[in-house]
Amino acid sequence: MHNGVLANSRKEERSGILNIADHLRPMGYRVGLTGKSHFRLGQQQFDGIDGFTGNANGDIAEYDLSGVRTYIRETQSAGSPFCVFICSVHAHHPWTVGDESHFPHEQLRIPPHYVDTPATRKAIAIHAAEVEEFDRQVGDVRAMLNESKLENDTILIVLSEQGIAMPRGKWSPYDHGSRAVCIAHWPGHFVPKKTSAIAMYSDFVPTFIDFAGGQSQVPLDGKSLKSLWLDERDKHRQSAFISNVHPFWQKAIVTEQYKLIWTGFPNEDHIHSNFASTKFFGKAWSEWKEASEKNRDVAAKIIRVLHPKRYELYDIQNDPYEVHDLAENGQYQNVKLGLLAELKQLMADAGESLEPKQPQGKEKERTRRRKKR
């Protein structure tokens, strides 16, 4: 799954946008939500359900499914179908939940684009511990559906967060920051399988409408996943458009085989301010920089983070960590140019400028610095 154009660096308030409740409530569905929520677009409100915290930056480890159970029971008593969003805050920072000892630091596999330091291993371990807590929540939800005799009548969809908050992860167009896990479960209907089909978060609204037997009231960017999940086809999209969400102009296109990344201002330091804070990756980033002073390979990794080339091309099938850039390899020029043309077309279709622009947040930050001088 790819975040795609769900959120980009432009913070414009879009009018006329319908949320999933706007689509499902007219079809008789009750639509509820517990836990984390960001968006406020649409006309219909979600029914609030107690049990899961909405504070992604807190230390609350406990959760309670009794509110969800009650909500589902009430909808059944009323003869209404339901759509419930259980929005976990795991594995969002501060990574204080879960048992780190389940992931011994010395046994961890370090991705090749990371610098192997004690703080790096610590960050991976505590993140994994919180992912394990998320997995436990998913198991509890499955058990609840089974106890309620609903598992065979309910589609359960599990989505991960978009990536670990480390360099070239969250807030970046690289796969560790734009690819998410999607698991769809419906016993007797979905054939167990793993697919490499490309999909985007925007595909879920038409998918829900399709399974509910309805029709969209307005044109939608997404495409229903119903026939893919029912094993009626094995492909979904040719490509996905990725627009970076942190304050650096980066656009990307990904296919099943390749990813092309276009960086608008490669001479600027591409390091999110959060990585300099102790809340996020500050200690590990300091260790990376210190190691780069004595190690040429580490220095090269730092440069790849801070100053990505204007164009990067990766064979993500054979290079999932995106460490072997093919953009300047003559054998791949046709691939590069073809993807760049397709990327520009997707940008135009999405109403994006084809000229790199400094995001407003970046411009304001520079203005503040100039005023201080």
Question: What does each model-found stretch correspond to?
Answer:
Residues 1-312, 320-348, 352-358, 363-373:
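Formylglycine-dependent sulfatase
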